[in-house]
Amino acid sequence: MKILIKGAGDLATGIASRLYGAGHQILMTEIAQPLTVRRTVALSRAVYDRRAIVEEMEAVSAKTQEDAEAIMEEGKIPVIVDPKADCRKWYKPDVIVDAIIAKKNTGTKITDAPFVIGIGPGFTAGKDCHCVIETKRGHTLGSVIWEGSAIADTGVPGNIGGYTTERLIRASEDGIIEPKVRIGDIVEKGQIVAVTGGKPVFAQMGGIVRGMLQPGAYVKKNLKIGDIDARAERSHCETISDKARAIGGGALEAAERFEKIKGHYAVVILAAGKGTRFSGERGESKLHAKIDQKPMYMHMMDKMQAFSSVELFIVTGDEKIIEEAEKRGIFVVRNKEPEKGIAHSVVLGLKAVSHSFKSGTDRKSGAPDGILFSVCDQPKLKISTIQRILNDAALHKKNVICAGYRGQKGNPVLWPAHCFAELLELTGDEGGRQMLTKYEEKVRIIETSREELKDIDSKREDRKSTRLNSSHEIPSRMPSSA
């Protein structure tokens, strides 16, 4: 796959090592003056040295798209100065890894690429990325987080050799840095290791200098400019750290999981129902009711924009919904007979997906591994829940996967390929409910919140969802209509 890594510091380099070693094509971005402390093991060094070698990887500074493409052709890694990662527009990566390590999101969006990985604090899986990799040293280091965020930054560095804050070398004043020691030198506590802004910087402990900013860089007072390792192993100064490798392993795991999903699944949004319980005598369409300032149907369509790696379809007969779907690149399947029930929509959607896969030229096979059916009246459903369903399907290809709460099955439901023939025989308004019963032992439930699974079937529920009438209780009906 084509992978874009934002940042080329030591942790980003550890990530690149794992992905590059697994055969993926890597492009890295940096700022004009990288402030990488562990620069001997960081590909960011290519920005000012023109090239950098870390273990088996060679990075070369690239100025243009043509430069970058030529470097990749040689099996090397281009590093391009591009703080906003505008290169993604021509590179068109399958995966973006934000490894800037700013402890906050500096502008990455979940729709920037088919799959987006956030490294460390500042990202939320299902909001601005598809998953987050834990960066805090300890039991969960390198774990893949599919819902929620990494542990918040405490401001206290991880323990190495029994030391935490003491091992950091910080600027004593604003100004230009003048290192007085080199990476790999042994220093003692109290020794002058650098001068910043004309003021000396003293070592707070003894050990080996594992990292130090390049001479001439402009720094701010208290900025981390170096670090000392009490273990005093010189080889540690020239090799990727255990932390960087663990984080890289998490990123590789996530990327490989995504590769099993990419191009193998489809999503069908069902939006052809009349919503009679909602509309009552006035004949209003349920799907056009405003939830959080936008029509209900838009919530699901907008969330599905995070899944550009799978084909998206919507079954509807509503002209306004058709117009909005086409704007978002969602393939429209027209249902001219909604009175036939939701099963008819399921059949129409399945046939459209099958036709698309058979006629596609870039498919590994003529059929998808599975289809996720989602209704349009679950405005609280999270992107992270959809992602977890797809993840599980990629590992359990023969199982039916659905969202649920405490064992109670709900929507969305992902049906594997071996169920397609039976789905085509469905009739009426039951959808796949009876099939879920038939395949009870094959159903895997992705546990989520009760709130996510509620659909809006009455105006009373609509008012509750939009917080206009908080005194009403929403019924806990969790349909398995798909």
Residue ranges and their predicted role:
Residues M1-K262:
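Well-ordered secondary-structure scaffolds
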Residues E339-E422:
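Conserved beta-loop-beta/alpha segment of the NTase-like Rossmann-fold superfamily
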Residues C402-D457:
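Phosphate-binding/catalytic loops
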